From Swiss-Prot:
It comes from the Viruses. This is Outer capsid protein P3. Keywords: Capsid protein, Host cytoplasm, Outer capsid protein, Virion. GO terms for cellular component: host cell cytoplasm; viral outer capsid.
Amino acid sequence: MDVTGAPYSSGLNVRNVLLTESTSTFTPIETYNVQDDIRTIRISAKIAEESVVSRVPLPVSFKPISEITKLFDIIPISRGSTTSIVEHPQTSFMIKLRDNTFSDYACLDHLVAFEPALILHRLKMLFSILGKYASSIISEVPTLDVMIDNAQVTVIDMSKFDDRNMNTYADRLPRDIEVYAAKQDILKQYVRTSVNETPITFRDDLPMPVRERPTLYRRYIVPFTPVELSLYNMALQMLDLQYCHPLIVYKYLQDRAPPFLVVNDQIGLEMLSAGDGELLPRPVMEVLDYSLVYSSPLALNNLGSLLMSRIKTSIKVRSINEVSSSLSEIVNASSTVSNSASSAIANMNVAGVETIAAFIIRSVLNPNISYAMIGKLDLDAFNDFIYGTCLLLLQAITPPSAIAAMSRVRINNALAYFLLRYICPQPVYTRLLQNDVIPSLTNTLEWSSVDRDILAAIYSNLFVADGRIWNLVSRYYRELPPEEVTQVSVPARETSYGINETRGISLPYLFGDAITEMRPDNRLNDYKQRLNLPSRSPILIANPMRNNVVDLTNVNVKMDFIMDLYDQNNFLKSPAQWVRNSASNSALLAKFRDSVSNITGILENVLSNAYSNAVNTYCDSVYRAGVPLNWKYRVVIDPKDMMFVIFGVCPRYVLMGDSIPDFFAGSEDILILQLVRAIWEVMSNHMGNVPTRFFRMEDVQRDLSEMVSIVLSKKIDVTKYFTDDMRSTTFSKEAWERFIARQIGEELPPLYRTILDQVETINNYMEQMMSIMPIVDHFYVVRNSGIAARGSVNPILAATTLNLNQINTTMIIRDWSELVRLVMTQQRVDLNTSHSLFEAEFYKLSEIASNEFVRSNERGEAEPHFTDVEAIRINMYARYELKIYKEQGEFSKPTKLNKVMHEDLTSFVKSNIGKPYPPVFTIPIDIMLNDLGECTSTKTRMRSFKVDEYFKCFTGAQVIIPLDYVNLEHVGSIQDLQVMFNGSVSVRIKPWTIKENFDVNYVQTGNHEVLIDPLPNVLPI
C-alpha cells in the first residue's frame, strides 16, 4: 500500500503508476490510477490550454477594410498665386507617408546612426509588420448596389472610407461638370467582381465539399495602394500556416493517442462533421526538452495557472451545527457571560477549510507561484486567543515561503507586543526599553513597522534568568540560540520586497528550516530520475510514516507552546478576553489540544496532491526571494478558518482523483526560449556577427524581446528568462551566454521556423518602403536657409530648408567621429575667447540675409539675388520630421516654426559624446502648401510688408535636409490619384469560423493491462 492510503471505508489497494512511451526523451508523462482488482486504467485527459495544439503563435484577426491601417495621407490643395487671384485654380494632391506608420516597437524614434543599427532597425520593422499587418485578414468591404448604364452594379460604398473617400476629393474640383465626371469614374472603377483563382487553398488533402474554391470569394477594387494591401494579403499565408480544418486535427489526435484512448465521440463527431470555412489551430507535435523550463523563474511562474488547475481536494467534514453545538456546550458550561469564544464559534467558516487546504497545497507544490497575506493581523492579534491559536497552528503546517515576509514580521512583532504587555516582568521590560531594544508600548506606529523583527531583537537581549518570557520566546524559536535566529538567509537587497529573510521569520514555520533550505518531498524521485525528468519536488509538509500515519510532531509541539502561551498562570496582567472567562477559555484551549490531530485531514490532501503532481514541471521546493510579489497569485488568509479545520475535519486515508499531467504542459515556455535562440540567430545572420559585437547587451535584449513578443502575440521580456540565480530578476550576461552556448537538442518546430521565414519574405515589401522612409544618410549645415516660391503656382510655397541645387558644399565631415573631434577641439581666437574647430568652419561659410531669400520683383515674383549657399555636408544618418501647413490667402504668420541651429547640433554632439554611435539626429522641416485657390480675396498680395514678413518666417534654419530628399509626392489630377490608389482584395463571402483553445477529451477504449509496480523501491516503506 502506498502512502496516499486506501479509499475511505474500502479495502482496495490503489497506486499511482507512471506510463510513458518507449523513448524516455519524449517528456509528456501520464500518471494513471490503477485498481488492483480490475487492472485497468481509468482515463481523464485534456489538452493543455496553453499548448501548441490549442494556441497559435500569431492568432489571425478579421477586420473590415475600414479599419485597415493606411500608410499614406492624401492632402488636397487648390493651387493659386501670391500675385493674383486664379479664376480656375488647379486641384491637385500631395501624398505623404504617415509619420507613425512604422514607429511601433521603437523603430524610427530609437534608430541609431550606425550601419548595424540600421540593419537591426529594419529587422525590427519586419517583425513589426508581421504582427501588425500580416496577421489581419480583410473580412468585410462595404458596398452599394447602383445602376450604371442601365445595369445593376455592386460598387464600393465610399462613405465608409473616411479619408479614402474618393468622392470627397472629387468635390474639391473647381467645376461642377468635373465633379460629376470624376464621381462617375469612381463608381465604375471601385466595384466588386468575381474571383478566378482561390486566394488560399490550404496544404491539406481534404474532401472536395470542405475544400476552398473560387466561388466562396469575391474581389473588390478599393482606394488603397497595392503596397498597403499586399501586407494584409500575407495574412492568408499565416492562416494556412497556423490553422487547418477540424478533420486534420481529428486525424492528428487519433494518431497521437495511446492504444487505449480515443477522442470523445461527441467531440469527434463535431470535428468530422465540420463544414468548409471551419478552422482549428493546426496541431504541431515536437519532442521538446522540458529542462528549458528550469532555466528561468518566469517560465515556472507561467505554469502557475496550470498548477492551480491541477489541485484537487477531498475533505470529509462534520456538520457545522454539530461542531457549533459541541463547542458551545464547553464554553457555556464554563462561563456565565458572553465572550469572544462564543462569537468565534458562531462565525466558524466551513468554506475556510477548502481555502486553507488549497492555499497550503499551492504553497508546497511551488513556493514561487503564490503568497498569502494574513488577514485581520494587527498588534492586538494575540489578545484574541482563538485567533492566536489558529495563527500559530497555521504556522506549524505552512512553509515560511507561503506567507509574505511582511506578514511574518508582523506576526513576530504582534507576539512580542503580547508578551511584553501580559507576561514580561516589569524590570525586564524597563531594561529592554532603556537599551533601545524595543519601542514603548504606546508607540504603536513603530511596533507596526516591518523594518525589523522586534521579537528577535528581544530574544537577543534576554537572559535565562528572565524566566517565563525567555522560555516562551526560546521555544517559539525552537530553542536555537539568538545568533542563529538573527542570521540572514537572504539579504533584503536580494529580495523583491526589501525585507531581510532571517531565520527568525522562518523558524516558527513547518520544520523550522531556513527559507533557503526547505525540505523536498522526494517520494517520486526515483520515478523522475528513471524518466529523465528533473529532480525538483514539492516541499515536504509532513513525514508520512508506516501504515499511512502522518507525523504530527510539528503540530503537537506548536500546540504545547500555545497552551503555555495562554496559561493564565503565566499572565502578570490578564488580557481582556480572560477577565471572567478564564475557565471557558482554558476549556476551549483544552479542546483545541484534544482535537488538533484532525489537521491530518488537511495534511493527507496536501501529501496526496504533492504525490500526484510531483512529475509536473511546476513543482519546486526552492524559494526564490527575487521573484516579484506581483508575479504571484495573492490570497488573504483568515487564521480563524483553522478553527473548523481543528474541530470539523474528519481525517481519513484518501487517494486523490486521477493524476494526469496535461499533454504538452510547459511547451509554451520551451517555445519562447527556443524562439529567443532562433531570432538571435536571425539577428546575427543579418548583421554578419553576433549583435553584442555592435550593441550593449541590454539594448540587444530589448530588441530581442520586441521581436519575440511579436511572434508570440504576447508581451515577452527576454531579460527575465536569464538571471544570476533563481532568487534574482536581474539580467545576467553569464546566464545568457550559457544559454546561447548551450547545445539545444531539438530545433525550432517547423511552424515557427516557417513564421521566421515569412519575416524574410516581408523584406521584399520593406525594400519598397525603405526608399520613402524619412531617413537620410547625410545632412547640411548652412548660415541661413529658406524657400519662398512667391508668384508661382507651385504646390509648395515655402519651406524651412533649401533645394539641393541651391547648395554649394565647401566641406565634408566624414562621420560621427570627425564631427565629435571638430566640436570638442577648441582653438583660441584671441587672448580672451576661443571656439571649436566646428564653429570656425561654420563661420567661414558665407552668410545670406533672410531678405535675400524672400526678395521679389515689382510683380511680386521671387527673385533672390544669390546663386548658391555655402554648406558643410555631414555624413551621418538623420531623420526629418515633416510639418505641413496650408496657405489660403490670409498670410498670417504661422505659429513658431521648428528650426535647428548650429548650436543645437553642437549640444547634440556634447550630450552624446560618450556614445560610439549616437541616436539619429532629428531635423524638422516645415512646409507651406499652396492652397491659395480657395481664396477669393481682392487684397493685394504682391509686395506688401505682410507678405514679406510671412515668407521671412521660413528662413533662418542652419541645419537642414534638402527638400529634394523629402518624400512628398505631388499628384496632379484626381485621375492620377485613382491610378495610385487602386488596390484589389479578395474576401471570403462567408468568413472563416475559428475555434481557439479547442478542448479534446480522450476516453478509454478496451483494457490496457500494466504492471502495478513497474519500478522497484519507489514507494516509501
